[in-house]
């Protein structure tokens, strides 16, 4: 039988017509002489009705069918006696005249329904079953819709879709590369790209002018949160473009995706916020602007405080900053606040000072030190009776990171965030360099090919401090999540050489690693820039999904393992031999 339409697309317009549908048994109810089956396919569910008196053969097929069996059924569409408002086909059903079991199924490892009681690893092991759950299939359909819009948008704006290599040279961009040994050249290795960054710059040197690609990227980094070792980005580059042109291009794409894929109109242009303001007010370079509770500096008000933690911090050139939790005095106990204090110690905070605002003044561990300054503090902070005020003292990043975390975690706990909002924001004027505590050195805040602000080029000269420089870079933020970023690129080989030097590369090391780019810069590289969107994270936010893994068909788990195929796995000795590799067994941990 040839399928006439998707089960989930069967409609009232087909009442009285004969249709053929095929799909999985989502539910089966045997009422004696009648059997009802909910047949599912990617478009939804339709109810099949099998009547023993009307068609014995079809009824017997339904009698043998079980959950997740695959059926094909031919029958007449008719109106349902009782409408089911929970499904799109709830006004009709199919009276089956002929049916056949196309495939049987073992008992599923978990219920194939949206509210599933199963571990994530079990779901990933049977991902092909997990994806039959309606919301999971809807995530894939949304992702497909977004990528379709992306292709159409860039095609209509004169961009060329150009593929770049996935086997290339190792040029680490902050994270570790995944390396691939060469059989032909023993001891030599390819690397999987962390991004198409260098190749898209070379495409601009080639005269492509406007490039885009939906690209796979790979980073061998320690997993945290929702990060994946392989991920997908919407990559773009434009020659002879100013930052405003690139941002307008991105806003046009976002506006169209929001309208066509999500049904939401977002106003453009998006707000712009300088990196410094984002850090000062939100404690984050990806601020969530859906709620207030802004960070405020009170260093000048407490510099002479009898509370030595505050006064000594300010005397050392550091900061005392605070947030006000509206109505928090009754909502957070001393025990609750201590838990918050313990958490922010991971950011380097020495402690968390707090007071509750009462009619009589401040109440709390440091109240006796601050009551003399209460009026000035309350005026600065707009604190009212019943509020909780949290203070952190320390260096710029300690204070920002700690209060940024407190701001976001408390907003979630107090339900201060409107989850239906989509607040897009540009964060601009980033520092060119940042100090990485893990690596113990200065690194590029975005990447080493980012062009500095024209006024800051002087900081690359001998005797100047390059770490004061700011870059022509910009991130696009949605609801406190970075979903993309970009910059104007360096097109002058002399400037590029100075940036490499500021990052600690010798001339020889820079030539060995990036010689091909330097050569391109010396052979007619146009002024250019671009950006990239993280497709996985963007779709996750549009779908209101719980995890980035929900919007990827076959993701890795939080340990970078794919339970379905048990990757990564071992290979046999013959494969290692032809690659001229030996594997040394890692020593066991001491017990």
UniProtKB/Swiss-Prot annotation:
Please list where the region (Aspartate) is annotated.
197-200
Give the UniProt keywords, A-Z: Aminoacyl-tRNA synthetase, ATP-binding, Cytoplasm, Ligase, Nucleotide-binding, Protein biosynthesis
Q: Main localisation, per the record? A: cytoplasm
Q: Which GO terms describe its biological process?
A: aspartyl-tRNA aminoacylation
Question: What CDD domains does the entry give?
Answer: AspRS_core, EcAspRS_like_N
Q: Where in the cell is it found?
A: Cytoplasm
In short, the EC number is 6.1.1.12
Annotated binding of L-aspartate, by residue:
173, 219, 446, 489
- Catalysed conversion reaction: tRNA(Asp) + L-aspartate + ATP = L-aspartyl-tRNA(Asp) + AMP + diphosphate
Q: Which GO terms describe its cellular component?
A: cytoplasm
Quote the record's binding site residues for ATP: 219-221, 228, 482, 534-537
Q: Which GO terms describe its molecular function?
A: aspartate-tRNA ligase activity; ATP binding; catalytic activity, acting on a protein; nucleic acid binding; transferase activity
Q: Which family does it belong to?
A: Belongs to the class-II aminoacyl-tRNA synthetase family. Type 1 subfamily.
The UniProt subunit note reads as follows: Homodimer.
Q: What does this protein do?
A: Catalyzes the attachment of L-aspartate to tRNA(Asp) in a two-step reaction: L-aspartate is first activated by ATP to form Asp-AMP and then transferred to the acceptor end of tRNA(Asp).
The protein's name in its UniProt record? Aspartate--tRNA ligase
Q: Which organism is it from?
A: Limosilactobacillus fermentum (strain NBRC 3956 / LMG 18251) (Lactobacillus fermentum)
């Amino acid at each position: 039988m040839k399928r006439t339409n998707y089960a989930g697309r069967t409609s009232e317009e087909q009442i009285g017509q004969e249709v053929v549908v095929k799909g999985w048994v989502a539910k089966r109810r045997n009422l004696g002489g009648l059997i009802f089956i909910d047949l599912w396919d990617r478009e939804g569910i339709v109810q099949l009705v099998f009547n023993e008196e009307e068609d014995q053969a079809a009824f017997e097929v339904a009698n043998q069918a079980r959950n997740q069996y695959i059926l094909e059924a031919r029958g007449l569409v008719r109106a349902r006696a009782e409408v089911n408002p929970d499904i799109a086909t709830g006004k009709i059903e199919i009276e089956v005249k002929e049916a056949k079991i196309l495939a049987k199924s073992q008992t599923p490892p978990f219920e194939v329904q949206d509210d599933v009681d199963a571990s994530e690893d079990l779901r990933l092991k049977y991902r092909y079953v997990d994806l039959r759950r309606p919301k999971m299939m809807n995530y894939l359909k949304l992702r497909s819709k977004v990528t379709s819009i992306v292709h159409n948008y860039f095609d209509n704006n004169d961009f060329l879709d150009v593929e770049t290599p996935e086997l290339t040279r190792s040029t680490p961009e902050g994270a570790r590369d995944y390396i691939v040994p060469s059989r032909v050249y023993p001891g030599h290795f390819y690397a999987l790209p962390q991004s198409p960054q260098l190749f898209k710059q070379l495409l601009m040197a080639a005269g492509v002018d406007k490039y885009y690609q939906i690209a796979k990227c790979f980073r061998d980094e320690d997993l945290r949160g929702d990060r994946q070792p392989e991920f997908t980005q919407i990559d773009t580059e434009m020659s002879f473009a100013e930052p405003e042109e690139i941002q307008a291009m991105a806003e046009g794409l976002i506006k169209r995706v929001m309208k066509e894929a999500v049904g939401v109109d977002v106003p453009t242009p998006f707000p712009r916020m300088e990196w410094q303001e984002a850090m000062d007010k939100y404690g984050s370079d990806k601020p969530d602007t859906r709620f207030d509770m802004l960070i405020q500096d009170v260093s000048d008000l407490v510099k002479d405080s009898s509370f030595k933690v505050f006064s000594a911090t300010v005397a050392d050139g550091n900061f005392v900053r605070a947030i006000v939790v509206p109505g928090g005095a009754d909502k957070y106990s001393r025990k609750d606040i201590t838990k918050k204090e313990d958490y922010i110690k991971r950011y380097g905070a020495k402690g968390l000072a707090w007071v509750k605002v009462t009619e009589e003044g401040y109440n709390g561990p440091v109240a006796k030190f601050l009551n003399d300054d209460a009026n000035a503090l309350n005026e600065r902070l707009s604190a009212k009776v019943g509020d909780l005020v949290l203070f952190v003292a320390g260096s710029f990043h300690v204070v920002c990171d700690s209060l940024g975390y407190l701001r976001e975690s408390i907003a979630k706990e107090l339900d201060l965030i409107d989850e239906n909002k989509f607040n897009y924001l540009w964060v601009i004027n980033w520092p060119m360099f940042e100090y990485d505590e893990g690596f113990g050195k200065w690194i590029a805040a975005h990447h080493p090919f980012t062009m500095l602000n024209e006024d800051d080029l002087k900081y690359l000269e001998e005797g100047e401090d390059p770490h004061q420089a700011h870059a022509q870079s910009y991130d696009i933020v949605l609801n406190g999540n970075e979903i993309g970023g970009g910059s104007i690129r360096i097109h002058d080989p002399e400037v590029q050489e100075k940036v490499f030097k500021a990052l600690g590369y010798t001339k020889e090391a820079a030539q060995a690693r990036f010689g091909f780019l330097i050569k391109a810069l010396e052979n007619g590289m146009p002024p250019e820039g671009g950006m990239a969107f993280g497709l996985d994270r963007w779709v996750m936010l549009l779908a209101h999904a719980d995890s980035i893994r929900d919007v990827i068909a076959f993701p890795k788990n939080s340990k970078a393992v794919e339970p379905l195929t048990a990757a990564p796995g071992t290979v046999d000795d013959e494969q290692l031999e032809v690659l001229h590799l030996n594997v040394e067994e890692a020593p066991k941990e001491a017990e």
